[in-house]
Amino acid sequence: MNSATPPADSAAFCADLVRSHDFPRYVATLFVPAVERRALLALYAFNVEIVRVRDQVSQPLPGEIRLQWWTDMLSGHAHGSVEGNPVAAELLRAIRDFELPVEPLSLLADEHQFDLYNDPMPTMTALEGYLAATCSALFTLAARIMAPPSEAVEHLARHAGLAQGIAQVITNLPRDAAHRQLFLPQQILDSHDCGIEDVFAGKESSNLRAVLDQLVSEAQQHLATAISLLAEVPPSVRPALLPLSQARADLKRLSRPGRNPFAPQPASRLRTLWTLWRASRSREFTK
């Protein structure tokens, strides 16, 4: 991997990318010192680039090629100039400066190959494995930028990622169903006699509500565990965990009776700012 220092405009590019596509994490970086903030924005911009691949291709093969470029870049075998890609250049700088492990970054990219296909998510265990390799890994890597790694931080990050990831699965249901793709576990759909074609058709039902209620409950349990572990990690890690407060707000919204699961409900940026600012001043992110 090339260790040349990328230009400052690469950092600005990453900041703009994260602000546009992952606003809660962008806001969380506002509570971080400049050096760590630059590394966090590089990490989050990498995640944005990986997640966006699904929406940038119409067939799986071009998506696989794009994801493979990132894994090749991380292993030092990228084709073409890495320095010409501002996100890659910034990510390599963050890896160098904070000794970030490459393997979880590569696994994150690999796991998102699932997004390129319309295969059903078979079980809750499979969903948790997917989220652990993506959302939880992102929390773990962000925490590593803020403080030395520890088992306590990894334990918290796993539950944080599962809580946030399940909330995102429910939030993204309208978009995913419109593309005939579901991250709702087939196992849970079957247990509530909820047909996948009904979900694709945008059909509201008590069966689907039962599925979503079960997932919200799972996410709330992970959220409660993550928050209970906050006291066991260094205070310097807390800014990397601030997106948990947005997950908590999302789960509260998603559990409201009578909510239409197929009606997109984008969060207000002002409300997101308020949520994370209040969380930054609260010991348990809950005020």
Feature locations, PLM:
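Catalytic cores of Mg2+-dependent Asp-rich isoprenoid enzymes
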Residues: M1-L92, P101-H112, L131-T140, S150-I166, ...
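Alpha-helical transmembrane segments of multipass membrane proteins
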Residues: L141-I145
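Flexible interhelical turns and helix-capping residues at alpha-helix boundaries
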Residues: P120, M146-S150
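Cofactor-binding active-site loop characterized by glycine-rich and histidine/acidic residues
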Residues: F98
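Acidic/His metal-coordination segments adjacent to aromatic residues that form catalytic metal sites
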Residues: Q113-A126, A201-S205
